[in-house]
Amino acid sequence: MAKKPKSNDKALAQNKKARHDYSILSTMEAGMVLTGTEIKSIRDRRVTLRDGYVQIRHGEAILMNVQINEYLQGNQFNHDPFRNRKLLLHKKEILKLQEETKNKGITIVPLKMYLKNGFAKVLIGVAKGKHEYDKRESLKKRDQQREIDRALKNR
């Protein structure tokens, strides 16, 4: 039996609530400017993306309200868990995000944080908020699909 090819992407944190509360229009990968203790905490999976969002300020994309807990062995050189972090994107990508968020009800949310070739990356998504009935409808569709999959599996 052949070995599976080893994937370089290792998901460290996911924002499942974002996929429930928003319909994702497009996604984009971005790097982050981090300190030493932040990357160590990320590798320990001590990250919360739930309330995070991205703002475009002065031509820079900034990841806000994402909690990266303090590194346990970090002593006096530890970081602030809620500090704003600059995202590393090309100028064209930032301008594209800025144009897309000009529409009412459109926001940018972090969906997933992972390591890629040793570097921490965040998958951000341009999203539009769902109404309550949209959320119920998507739950209903997911349950129906699950039932269909179970029925086909048990055949």
From Swiss-Prot:
Q: Which InterPro entries match?
A: SmpB, SsrA-bd_prot, SsrA-bd_prot_CS
User: Any idea where this protein resides?
Assistant: Cytoplasm
An annotated GO cellular component of this protein is: cytosol
Range of residues in the leader sequence: none
Look up keyword RNA-binding and say if it applies: yes
One Pfam family of this chain: SmpB
Keywords, sorted A to Z: Cytoplasm, RNA-binding
Location of the region described as Disordered in the Swiss-Prot/TrEMBL record: 134-155
**MF terms per GO, please?**
RNA binding
- Could you tell me which NCBIfam families the record lists for this protein? PRK05422.1, smpB
Question: Which family would the database say this protein is a member of?
Answer: Belongs to the SmpB family.
Q: What does this protein do?
A: Required for rescue of stalled ribosomes mediated by trans-translation. Binds to transfer-messenger RNA (tmRNA), required for stable association of tmRNA with ribosomes. tmRNA and SmpB together mimic tRNA shape, replacing the anticodon stem-loop with SmpB. tmRNA is encoded by the ssrA gene; the 2 termini fold to resemble tRNA(Ala) and it encodes a 'tag peptide', a short internal open reading frame. During trans-translation Ala-aminoacylated tmRNA acts like a tRNA, entering the A-site of stalled ribosomes, displacing the stalled mRNA.
Q: What is this protein called?
A: SsrA-binding protein
**Lineage of the species this protein comes from:** Bacteria, Bacillati, Bacillota, Bacilli, Lactobacillales
